[in-house]
């Protein structure tokens, strides 16, 4: 008897690793030193509040979980993991770049480098080989736009 094929072009586990990594990243942002909110206030966004941080993530994380769950369960929804992977990959790059630019650890950098970059790159690479160019490009653009929208929400005063 053979095992059933993966439900997604990415397999079942890989898409679901993205929202799991997101939770680990949130834990790092909240629990590291004074936390990401304080880091942002001191360097980039003086009006950034814990309430805004929580509100943003209470919207974004369930959305990421839903998209990645659909991608894990149905091959025709593989493209739904692409925006999540793209946004997390960019977030990992930005945490690393911010730490270097400001000469100070940005809470979230460790999980950004250790989880977001390899997971994001793996999902994007596999999706680029599984999907037609148009759905892949749309997913990539959607992820970049979503990350930009989150950044704008964080910087809004």
Residue positions per predicted region:
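N-terminal signal-anchor transmembrane alpha helix
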Residues: 8-29
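Membrane-interfacial loop-to-transmembrane alpha-helix junctions, especially the N-terminal start
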Residues: 11-15, 76-84, 136-137
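Membrane-interface helix caps and helix-loop-helix hairpins in membrane proteins
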Residues: 96-107, 155-156
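Core segments of transmembrane alpha-helices
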Residues: 56-71, 88-91, 116
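Interfacial loop at the N-terminal end of multi-pass membrane proteins
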Residues: 27-53
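Terminal transmembrane helical module of multi-pass membrane proteins
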Residues: 122-157
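Aromatic-anchored segments of alpha-helical transmembrane domains
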Residues: 23-27, 87-96, 143-153
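Hydrophobic alpha-helical membrane segments
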Residues: 86-95, 108-126
